[in-house]
Amino acid sequence: MGVKLLAIAWGLAEATVFFIVPDVLLTYLALKDPRRAAKACLWVLVGSLVGGTAMFCWGNYDLKGTEEFLTQIPAIDEELLNKVEQQIDDDGVKATFFGPIAGRPYKIYAAYAGAKDISFPSFLLVSIPARLLRFILLTWITWWVASKLLTKLQTRKKAFVLTAVWIAFYSWYFAIM
């Protein structure tokens, strides 16, 4: 029950206020138990969709307030908001699929989808593969690397390697954003 609630909460938090992706949790779970990690992907998706729904509604109701809130989150600034808004204007709901793959926060796409009167069912349907694809892919890659390339390392050492990877990733991400 603990992992399920943590996965839902992290998915919800990252889709609204938090800036560390739930993939961190999922990849650590994948080191020990890929099936448990795969199930957690679904629970993260549930939380993410709830959070995306909240941001969609807030963007529809009060885009200015949503934008002010979003710019208080690390790595989100007005320039990024403008890029996402333009992408939503140009590509509609498809932007919700491709944007987060490019490293742009889903929460921004959700807010602008609501503000730009994209249909909620379309937004939700696109959100499912947009979120789940990355969760499952990173979980699978982590499991594969840990079980095929790092076979001689103990789980604790694999976790250390994974920690180093996440620290390097976020150091790079915050440097470019």
Across the structure, where does each feature detected by a protein language model lie?
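Final/C-terminal transmembrane alpha-helix of multipass membrane proteins
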Residues: K158-M177
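Membrane helix-loop-helix hairpins that form the core translocation module of multi-pass transporters
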Residues: A38-N82, Q86, D90-K94
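Hydrophobic transmembrane alpha-helix bundles
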Residues: C41, N60-G65, E78-L80, R134-W144, ...
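Hydrophobic alpha-helical membrane segments of integral membrane proteins
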Residues: G2-W43, E85-K148, W172-A175
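Membrane-interfacial segments
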Residues: L29, D33, D62-P74, V145, ...
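Membrane-interfacial entry segments at the cytosolic side of transmembrane helices
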Residues: K39-L42, K152-L162
